Amino acid sequence: MAVVLQNNVLFSGTILQNLRWGNENATLEECQEACRLACADEFVQRFEDSYNTYIEQGGTNVSGGQKQRLCIARALLKKPKILILDDSTSAVDTATDASIQQSFEERIPDTTKIIISQRISSVQNADRIIVLNDGVVDGFDTHEKLLKTNAIYQTIHETQTKGKEEA
């Protein structure tokens, strides 16, 4: 099992060293593949030293979204049967979040993913969605059924898609 939290930790050392906290025996190619799945490879390749780029303690020299994607890649290197993502894409834009979700569906379909998110777009393709209201389960179903039956889910969906439909 691997867990990626919203507030994640990077250590002082290279990107490659940080990734290998997930699997100390991971090859460069495995690290690159995990980064591709987490939509991190592209920005890592833009650094002058690529995977040998030094990360400051706490990851202060990368953005919040970059930090989250590196931590997702690190978790993927564990090759977990269960992957828990606790609001772990909150600092990335919705397009990147969608790309990460799509790569999970296509490349790691047999991994059980538990996704905790405030973004409906992050969970809408899940087999089942749990809607919580003040810590109490208010709904449990598919995206389509919750849109028809759950007022809280409907309101959140409407709020999050309103700007997209007007654009």
Regions found by a protein language model. Name each.
Residues 93-103:
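Conserved D-loop/post-Walker B switch-helix segment of ABC ATPase nucleotide-binding domains
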Residues 1-9, 23, 58-59, 120:
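ABC ATPase nucleotide-binding domain signature
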Residues 41-70, 85-88, 92-95, 162-167:
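ABC-fold ATPase nucleotide-binding domain signature/coupling loops
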Residues 37, 46, 50, 102, ...:
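C-terminal portion of ABC ATPase nucleotide-binding domains
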Residues 77-81, 110:
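A short, proline-enriched helix->beta-strand linker immediately N-terminal to the Walker B motif
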Residues 16-57, 101, 110:
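ABC ATPase nucleotide-binding domain helical subdomain, centered on the C-loop/LSGGQ "ABC signature"
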Residues 72, 116:
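Hydrophobic anchor residue at the start of the ABC signature
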